[in-house]
Design a protein with these regions (language model features):
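Anionic group-transfer/hydrolysis microenvironments
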Residues: 137, 176-177, 185, 244-246, ...
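Protein kinase-like catalytic core scaffold
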Residues: 132, 172, 192, 253-258
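Phosphate-binding site of ATP-dependent enzymes
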Residues: 148-236
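Active-site nucleotide/adenylate-binding loops and adjacent lid/helix of ATP-dependent enzymes
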Residues: 6-9, 79, 87-174, 178-179, ...
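A long amphipathic alpha-helix within ATP-dependent nucleotide-binding catalytic cores
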Residues: 204-256, 277-292
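A short beta-strand motif that forms the metal-chelation/ATP-contact edge
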Residues: 56-60, 184-186, 251-267
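Conserved N-proximal alpha/beta basic substrate-recognition cap immediately N-terminal to
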Residues: 8-113
Length: 300
């Protein structure tokens, strides 16, 4: 019987602001769950990807550096199963994600994609957006300034100036939604789905979850949330995912405000890891292949 060799790619700490230990924990638990299922797991860094030092029958990982994403895409193009897909990770950049979720008619805040060199106030007025969230459009969040709550159009103008001065050319603007903030985690093709109130557990990166205040327990349709999240994951091509939504305090509807490739699963990592391992093993069965670059010998 063939023993599958699975390469695990750790996330570079730059892409784990305030969550380095949590990201490392879910990576470790997933690797152990795969080993318990009979796989040989080789652990690599994102730098190993750039050096073409990865050899395996399949890859799982949390890479987010643009160079790493391109490496994963090349592996996929060569027939290697990769979870999450490099193409799916790229779609989780703010701009492509906003376009895709909007085009798929998924419940989502009114959003604009604007050049930071422009004055955003006319576009905000036209869209009837006042308080909003301003997010850099080019890739994943790596610092507190990459996502900013702007309480007014004038504040948004100031945020645009700062982003432009920092060399960020495009911003995504999401209208601010009032209501309960709910965070969720899921694994496609499995029964795993977990949702919770982050303010109740003090779970967050930069304290931005405090803008909406403590959860009030506004009633919402949990099955509808799960269905919406699975739909969004399918649109983006993600298999291991998480994100945030707002349960409206006016109509009780759930709207997605963020969607991520392979989050930390911090409050539920022990329960999630076996399902993630099953997802990875299932991908091997769906897309048999192997990848061994010439001279590859690095094994962590």
């Amino acid at each position: 019987m063939h023993t599958y060799i699975v390469a695990g790619i750790r996330r570079d700490p730059r892409f784990s602001p305030h969550h380095e230990a949590s990201d490392e924990a879910i990576f470790h638990l997933t690797a152990e769950a795969l080993r318990a299922r009979g796989c040989t797991v080789r652990e690599y860094t994102e730098a190993d990807l750039w050096a073409d030092a990865v050899s395996a029958d399949a890859v799982f990982g949390m890479a987010r550096d643009p160079r790493s994403i391109r490496c994963l895409q090349r592996m996929e193009d060569g027939g290697l199963p990769v979870v999450n897909s490099g193409y799916a990770i790229a779609r989780c950049g703010r701009e492509p994600m906003t376009r895709l979720l909007t085009e798929a008619d998924l419940p989502h805040p009114r959003s604009l994609i604007l050049p930071t060199a422009d004055d955003p106030v006319p576009a905000l007025a036209s869209a009837a957006i006042d308080a909003c969230w301003v997010k850099r459009a080019d890739g994943h969040v790596v610092g507190a300034g990459d996502v900013t709550f702007a309480a007014s159009r004038e504040v948004t103008r100031e945020v645009f100036r700062r982003l432009s001065d920092d060399g960020i050319r495009t911003a995504v603007v999401n209208e601010h939604l009032t209501g309960d903030l709910v965070k969720f985690y899921g694994v496609a093709g499995t029964d795993f789905f977990y949702a919770f109130y982050p303010t109740a557990t003090h779970h967050g990166k930069f304290g931005l979850e405090q803008v909406n205040g403590p959860a009030r327990g506004i009633a919402y349709d949990a099955d509808a949330l799960r269905t919406t999240c699975h739909r969004a994951a399918t649109v983006l091509g993600l298999r291991v995912y998480g994100g945030d939504c707002i349960v409206s305090d006016t109509d009780g509807l759930v709207r997605l405000i963020d969607f991520n490739d392979w989050p930390s699963f911090a409050p539920c990592r022990e329960a999630a890891a076996p399902f993630i391992a099953s997802c990875i093993i299932g991908s091997i069965g769906l897309r048999p292949g192997s990848y061994a670059p010439s001279g590859a010998s690095s094994q962590k």
